[in-house]
């Protein structure tokens, strides 16, 4: 939620993978639980693609929707209990589905901190078009800023997983 749109055209890289991984953890605790993952464009980077396959094998239901037809959520009472009714057009089935959910979890975009511009000004470092900190040179100096003595690592640079952050920290 909140990326790969006009406001933020980048992929947060961690949202889809964590949604799938959390679905697997829920299935581990209760194999009979119904889990739906609604997505516009599933992107499970690296070995996280294995999580996607495993989740599919464990009957996690993946529903793709088009950006023009986003899911709608309403609080309703069904069978005497409050639920969240999620209405989503299924692009593959060509029909609109209604899912009554007890819980709803959003995989939110990784966005730069509101103080990023202020920090960039203090350290005299540059930002990329998405307002993440920009390295001096993507190939030759990937953890350096143009300003000397200041180094770059982790999601301040761009959305990334922890192993990528650790690798970047080693320089």
Model-identified regions with their sequence ranges:
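Residues forming the flavin
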Residues: 1-171
């Amino acid at each position: 939620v909140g990326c790969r749109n006009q406001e933020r055209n980048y992929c947060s890289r961690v949202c889809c993978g964590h949604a799938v991984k959390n679905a697997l953890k829920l299935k581990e605790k209760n194999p009979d639980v119904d889990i739906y993952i609604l997505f516009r464009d599933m992107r499970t980077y690296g070995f996280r693609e294995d999580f996607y396959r495993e989740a599919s094998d464990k009957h996690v239901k993946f529903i793709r929707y088009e950006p023009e037809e986003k899911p709608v959520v309403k609080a309703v009472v069904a069978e005497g209990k409050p639920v969240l009714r999620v209405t989503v057009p299924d692009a593959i089935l060509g029909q609109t589905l209604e899912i009554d959910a007890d819980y709803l979890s959003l995989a939110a975009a990784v966005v730069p901190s509101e103080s990023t511009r202020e920090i960039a000004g203090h350290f005299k470092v540059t930002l990329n078009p998405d307002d993440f900190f920009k390295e001096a040179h993507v190939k030759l100096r990937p953890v350096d800023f143009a300003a000397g003595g200041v180094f770059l690592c982790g999601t301040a640079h761009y959305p990334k997983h922890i192993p990528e952050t650790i690798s970047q920290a080693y320089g």
